[in-house]
């Protein structure tokens, strides 16, 4: 048995790749997991539901505001210090063989605590541009797994640690009850802008079937009036629908792009440009460069442009599915280092 401590939460973009890694590790060896979740965030809820066998510890911590000299960061830095002491106590008790981190502020806390205790650290960065936690933790990590080759440019000092794997995707045996549809997503909390845009598109494309994850019951009711739209407040598991989709329309979070590329679904990406350090725009442009997507900037998005782009991606057809889940590559690398 190996004991793994893990953190990477606050958003689905950090959480789901981490769960994919842990679930793949568990298929290869007997694993006991200590999971550090952010109190009140998605990881706390999802991990307790999907993995009751994990020991889940909720930590009350919030990330630093931008710019970093923001006056509220003094209080947040104090809370990070308190949280680090709490995490150290749990790590000393659990005695993990390694720590797996996928970014976000909770990763910074757990990673620095693990570094002080001499626990091997493995990091994964989902985005093209690494976040602050990954930049800091890369110097202490045994391996730094990245989704894109271009991420090397942002971590030049740690080239010998970097392994380009792609972004892990959670596997599922489930199948969507529909097929040959355009999948519309706005992230785990939905997207008002995408919902409003698609409400104007649907009447113009009545021969095309859509499955739309709305993020709210109000929007689900509102979009259900269109006979060519299956509106769902939340889709779980996502993989069941990606398997059957012929195209997609979404924001450009790393997990969404990872699933799009893994299942070979061409997409239209409308990046959320207020995301930290322009992560989504950089992710979208890289997916477009690799031939998986058409990028439409939000200030340029119109129903006509979306309709024209849907026609292009549907005609392009599905791309060959990846032969190996990046989660599998990562689990092999980790086990090769510690076994």
UniProtKB/Swiss-Prot annotation:
Magnesium recorded as keyword: no
CDD domains: GT28_MurG (cd03785)
Main location: membrane
One cellular component term from this protein's GO annotations in UniProt: plasma membrane
Superkingdom of the organism of origin: Bacteria
Pathway in which this enzyme or protein is active: Cell wall biogenesis; peptidoglycan biosynthesis
EC number: 2.4.1.227
Membrane topology: Peripheral membrane protein
Pfam families, sorted: Glyco_tran_28_C, Glyco_transf_28
UniProt keyword annotation of Cell membrane present: yes
MF (Gene Ontology): glycosyltransferase activity; UDP-N-acetyl-D-glucosamine:N-acetylmuramoyl-L-alanyl-D-glutamyl-meso-2,6-diaminopimelyl-D-alanyl-D-alanine-diphosphoundecaprenol 4-beta-N-acetylglucosaminlytransferase activity; undecaprenyldiphospho-muramoylpentapeptide beta-N-acetylglucosaminyltransferase activity
Subcellular location: Cell inner membrane
Catalytic activity: di-trans,octa-cis-undecaprenyl diphospho-N-acetyl-alpha-D-muramoyl-L-alanyl-D-glutamyl-meso-2,6-diaminopimeloyl-D-alanyl-D-alanine + UDP-N-acetyl-alpha-D-glucosamine = di-trans,octa-cis-undecaprenyl diphospho-[N-acetyl-alpha-D-glucosaminyl-(1->4)]-N-acetyl-alpha-D-muramoyl-L-alanyl-D-glutamyl-meso-2,6-diaminopimeloyl-D-alanyl-D-alanine + UDP + H(+)
Listed Gene3D superfamilies: Glycogen Phosphorylase B (3.40.50.2000)
Record-listed UDP-N-acetyl-alpha-D-glucosamine binding positions: 11-13, 127, 170, 188, 235, 280
GO terms (BP aspect): carbohydrate metabolic process; cell division; cell wall organization; lipid glycosylation; peptidoglycan biosynthetic process; regulation of cell shape
UniProt xrefs under SUPFAM superfamilies: UDP-Glycosyltransferase/glycogen phosphorylase
Keywords: Cell cycle, Cell division, Cell inner membrane, Cell membrane, Cell shape, Cell wall biogenesis/degradation, Glycosyltransferase, Membrane, Peptidoglycan synthesis, Transferase
Record's function text: Cell wall formation. Catalyzes the transfer of a GlcNAc subunit on undecaprenyl-pyrophosphoryl-MurNAc-pentapeptide (lipid intermediate I) to form undecaprenyl-pyrophosphoryl-MurNAc-(pentapeptide)GlcNAc (lipid intermediate II).
HAMAP family to which the protein is assigned, alphabetical: MurG
Family affiliation: Belongs to the glycosyltransferase 28 family. MurG subfamily.
Annotated PANTHER family: GLYCOSYLTRANSFERASE, UDP-N-ACETYLGLUCOSAMINE--N-ACETYLMURAMYL-(PENTAPEPTIDE) PYROPHOSPHORYL-UNDECAPRENOL N-ACETYLGLUCOSAMINE TRANSFERASE 1
Database matches in NCBIfam families: murG
Identification of the protein by name: UDP-N-acetylglucosamine--N-acetylmuramyl-(pentapeptide) pyrophosphoryl-undecaprenol N-acetylglucosamine transferase
Organism in which the protein naturally occurs: Thermotoga maritima (strain ATCC 43589 / DSM 3109 / JCM 10099 / NBRC 100826 / MSB8)
Gene: murG
